[in-house]
Amino acid sequence: MRDEQGGGGSDDFTVQNSIPRAPNMAADDNIDCHNRNSSFSATSPAALYDQGRLSGEGSPMMMSPWNQTACSPFTKSACWSSSGFEDEAFATNAAGAMQNTLIGSLVREEGHIYSLAASGELLYTGSDSKNIRVWKNLKEFSAFKSSSGLVKAIIVSDRKIFTGHQDGKIRVWKVSPKAPNIHKRAGTLPTLKDIFKSSINPSNYIEVKKKRTALWIKHADAVSCLSLSEDGGLLYSASWDRTIKVWRLSDSKCLESIKAHDDAVNFVVAAADGLVFSGSADGTVKVWRRDSLGKSSAKHSLAETLLQQECAVTSLAADKAASIVYCGSSDGLVNHWERTKDKFSHGGVLRGHKLAILCLAAAGPLLMSGSADKTICVWRREGAIHTCLSVLTGHNGPVKCLAVEVDPASAKSGGGSDQRWIVYSGSLDKSVKVWRVSELPADVGHAAAAALPRFDEDSLPGSDGSQASSARRDSHNKRV
C-alpha cells in the first residue's frame, strides 16, 4: 500500500481580514470590534445571568449570549498571537480575578473544522478539506492528507494517530521516529488482511440497509467519533450505521460490533471500570459494560439507558472516573448524571445555549459546552451544583469540537487554587481558537449581584426539560 505522508508546514497561507462563514450561515450584525490587536476576552457571566439562580435547582442559568457583542476574531495572518497578551492574562489571574481570555486564533482558508485532538505540545485539526494539520505553539508544524474525505474524528495514542472519516474508514498514521513532523499512513481499520479473510465466510456479512449487506467488521456509514479505553488497549468507533465497533490496538483486530442504537450513533466515550457511554440521534444515552475487563477479548452488554427523548443526542462527555456524565442535545440543553456505586442518578439540566450543543469537554471541575449558537459556556461543578463562569464568544460559526489540556504554566507552578486550562475550539467558520480558562469563579460583589437582570422562567423549559420554548426547539441536524 502506498504511504501518504506530510512534512513540515508550508508557507502558502492566505492573508485575510475576515474569517469566511460556513455555508448558509447568516451574518451576525451584533459582532463589533472594539479592542486593540483584534483580541478579546470572555463575556462576563455577570452581564448575562442571575448568578444566584443555579442550574442544579432547575432554574434558568442565563440569558442566551446570541446577541452579546464581542470583538471580531478577524486575523491578519493564518496563525496569530498577540504579543504581550498572554502576560497580561497571567497577571490578571495571578491577581485573583477570573479572566478567561483568547490566546490566539488559527485560520487557514481550506475547510470547516470538524475534529480536534490535543497531545502534549501538539494540536491536530481535521476538516472537510481531507487535511489533518498539526500545530505547535500556535504555528503550523506539519500536515498530512487522507483520501478518505471529511475528517470527523481524531484521537492520539502514543505515536499513532487514528482518524475517522465520512466515508466510514478509520485511518492509522505513525509519527516518523527520525522526524516528528513526518506522518506516514500505517494502514486502515479493519486491515486489508482481515477484510480478505472475513469476506470468504458468508456468515460475516450482515444486512446494513434494505437489500444491502456488508462485512460486520467494517463501518457502513460515516465514523462520527473515536474513543480510547482507560488502559489504552482498545479503540471504540461510533458510526452513523448505528453500531459501535471495538478494536484491539495491539493487532488492529475488530473484536466486536455492537448494534447500539436505532439511529446514527453520534458519540461514544470510554471511561473507567470498563464503562462505555453512547449517544444517538434516536434520543437515547446508553451505558455499556465491558464484561471481560482486563482480558485480551472484549464483550460488552447494555447496563443502563440514562435518557430517552425526542431530541437527538449530539454530544457526550465524562470525567476519567466515570463519576459524572454529560449529554448535550439538539435542543440546546445539557443533562448530567452522577454515579453512585453502580447506578447513575439524574443531576439536573444546564441551560446556557440557544441552539444545539455540538461538543462537550470535561476537565477537572470544569465543563466546556460548544454550540451552534457560536459560543462556548464554561461551567464549574461544586457538588451537585453547576455555575456558569463565563461565555467565550468570537467564533463566527457553530462551535463543532473542543479539546482541553492543562495549562503548562499552571502545571509548573503547581496550580494551587487557580488551576488553568488551555481550551481549543474548532468551528465551521474555518478557525480554531485557543483560550486560557481558569477554575476560579468570578468575584461578583453583592451590589453587582443585586443589579443582575432577572428572567421569566416560563420562557425557558421546565426543570425536567419536558417543555421547550420556540427558542429551544430542535435546532440542528440529528447527525453530527
Which role does the model predict for each range below?
Residues 126-129, 164-167, 222, 231, ...:
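Conserved strand-to-loop turn within each blade of WD40 beta-propeller repeats
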Residues 110-116, 149-155, 196-199, 212-228, ...:
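Canonical WD40 repeat/beta-propeller blade segments in eukaryotic WD-repeat proteins
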Residues 1-58, 62-63, 68, 183-211, ...:
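Terminal intrinsically disordered, low-complexity extensions flanking WD-repeat/beta-propeller proteins
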Residues 132-136, 170-174, 238, 244-248, ...:
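WD40-repeat beta-propellers
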Residues 174-181, 289-297, 338-342, 380-384, ...:
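Short loop/turn segments immediately following beta-strands, especially the blade-tip
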Residues 103-108, 141-146, 185-191, 214-218, ...:
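Short C-terminal beta-strands that terminate individual repeats in beta-propeller domains
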Residues 121-124, 142, 159-162, 232-236, ...:
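Structural hallmark of WD40 beta-propellers
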